[in-house]
UniProtKB/Swiss-Prot annotation:
Its EC number is 4.2.1.-. Belongs to the D-glutamate cyclase family. It is an enzyme of class 4 (lyase). The keyword Oxidoreductase does not apply. InterPro entries: D-Glu_cyclase, Putative_hydro-lyase, UPF0317. The lineage of its organism: Bacteria, Bacillati, Bacillota, Clostridia, Peptostreptococcales. This is Putative hydro-lyase Amet_2975. It comes from Alkaliphilus metalliredigens (strain QYMF).
Length: 260
């Protein structure tokens, strides 16, 4: 699957042949978090992303009712090309579904937000291990004690993803990821999880628990699940997102996203 074209991957997702997390899928292409919400809430959400660019770097925005992201996937259909979606009603998770054709209306605005899965290929190619990819797991994600800047109806805490990195490679990991500004860039924290309010690193809020080996340091990047916490607080009537770890594969290459 990893060697297939992006269009082949979209088709596989649409027909139910891929229903797993997308870390490591389509190496060399940018992955994106998905937030779809009514037009009346779109400006407040846009402002929230602008004020919190580290966890919410915007890759693309659709017009109301538009299903093909004009920059990130002009041949895609956002309603069927994500492996798993979440449906939120009034801030509460209602269900997870495989497509959103029955929920998407002409009033819905789609936001694509950068994802740290994008820089994992670069880490691997330059000798920095990525544990969850080695083990075929979803990345560990945590809600922190850091608050984002509020905007309109949206407010909430920063969410981070974590990758255990051998101590001697931490500086290298920072250097590699920093240029990927549209994929969260450099880490927001290195070391003690307690400083982020994480009491037990083995108890994740999203994803799967980590396997941290001796001599490794937990390294935390801002995460595009952050908007889902803000959406829960804002309690809009209906919001659709990707399920954490099940991203939209864009047709933008890693080289292109690093230049944005």
């Amino acid at each position: 699957m990893n060697t297939k074209s992006v269009k082949d991957i979209w088709k596989a997702i649409e027909f139910g042949e891929w229903r797993k997390p997308t870390s490591g899928l389509a190496p060399g292409y940018t992955q994106a978090n998905v937030v779809i919400l009514p037009k009346k809430d779109a400006f407040d959400f846009l402002l929230f992303c602008y004020r919190n660019e580290k966890p919410c770097p915007i890759v693309d925005i659709c017009e109301p009712g538009q299903v093909a992201p004009p920059v990130a996937g002009p041949d895609a259909d956002i309603r069927v090309h994500v492996p798993k979606y979440r449906i939120y009603r009034h801030g509460e998770l209602d269900k997870e579904v495989d497509d959103i054709k029955s929920y998407f209306t002409e009033d819905m605005v789609t936001f694509l937000i950068g994802c740290s899965f994008t820089f994992e290929k670069e880490l691997l190619e330059k000798g920095v291990p990525v544990r969850h990819m080695e083990e075929g797991k979803n990345v560990p994600m945590y809600v922190t004690n850091r608050q984002c800047q509020s905007a309109g109806i949206f407010s909430g805490p920063l969410v981070v993803s974590m990758r255990p990195i051998p101590a001697h490679l931490v500086d290298k990991a920072v250097e590699i990821t920093a240029p990927f500004r549209k994929a969260h860039g450099a880490p927001v924290h290195i070391g003690d999880p307690a400083e982020l309010g994480i009491k037990d690193i083995n108890k994740v809020d999203f994803g799967e628990p980590p396997n941290i080996k001796e001599g490794e340091i937990p390294v935390f990047w801002a995460c595009g699940v952050t908007p889902q916490m803000a959406l829960k607080n804002a309690r809009p009537e209906l919001v659709i997102t990707h399920s954490p770890g099940y991203m939209f594969i864009t047709s933008i290459t890693d080289e292109e996203i690093a230049r944005l």
